[in-house]
């Protein structure tokens, strides 16, 4: 009955607390509930799943978890870190699903907003480089082109303190190319 109540966004946070405090295997229940909500409820649940080690939840975090009807920016960093986006992009041929999600996550991180942005992501430079390498020579969609353009605009911003961001993998070579 808690899950039924939790599917209503205005009650999701309270149900998440109740599930976390009373049910065994709470993580599985929170994940199941997160699939049914897409507003603030999803945001609250994904935040509570940020410490997961479950490979299925980690994959979901990258491919679906960041998506919400408020702002992708709220969950982009959590999902990139929890789902280990860098690891997924280190694979020789990431799936189209991973590439689309990676682009949307990178785009949200660059957009910034009220949540932590790309400057807070320790793997930012590596993830962007891998995304660019996988995108090279492909027939990119309009959405992918827009993401590539936002990467270019971000990397060419002269006002950014690139020395400070070098610890996040931003090299001069990456920014020039």
Show the residue positions of the predicted features:
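Structural detector for internal amphipathic alpha-helices that build alpha-solenoid repeat scaffolds
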Residues: 1, 12-24, 32-33, 43-52, ...
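Eukaryotic alpha-helical scaffold "rod" segments
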Residues: 1-2, 7-10, 38, 156-159, ...
């Amino acid at each position: 009955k808690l899950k039924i109540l939790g599917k209503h966004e205005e009650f999701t946070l309270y149900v998440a607390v109740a599930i976390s405090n009373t049910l065994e295997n709470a993580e599985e229940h929170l994940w199941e509930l997160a699939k049914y909500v897409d507003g603030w409820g999803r945001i609250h649940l994904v935040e509570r799943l940020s410490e997961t080690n479950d490979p299925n939840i980690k994959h979901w975090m990258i491919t679906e978890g960041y998506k919400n009807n408020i702002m992708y920016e709220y969950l982009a960093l959590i999902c990139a870190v929890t789902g280990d986006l860098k690891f997924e992009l280190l694979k020789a041929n990431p799936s189209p699903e991973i590439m689309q999600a990676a682009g949307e996550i990178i785009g949200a991180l660059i957009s910034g907003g009220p949540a932590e942005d790309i400057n807070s992501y320790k793997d930012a430079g590596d993830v962007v480089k891998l995304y660019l390498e996988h995108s090279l020579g492909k027939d990119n969609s309009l959405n992918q082109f827009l993401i590539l353009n936002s990467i270019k605009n971000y990397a060419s911003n002269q006002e950014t303190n690139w020395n400070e961001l070098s610890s996040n993998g931003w090299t001069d070579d990456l920014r020039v190319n």
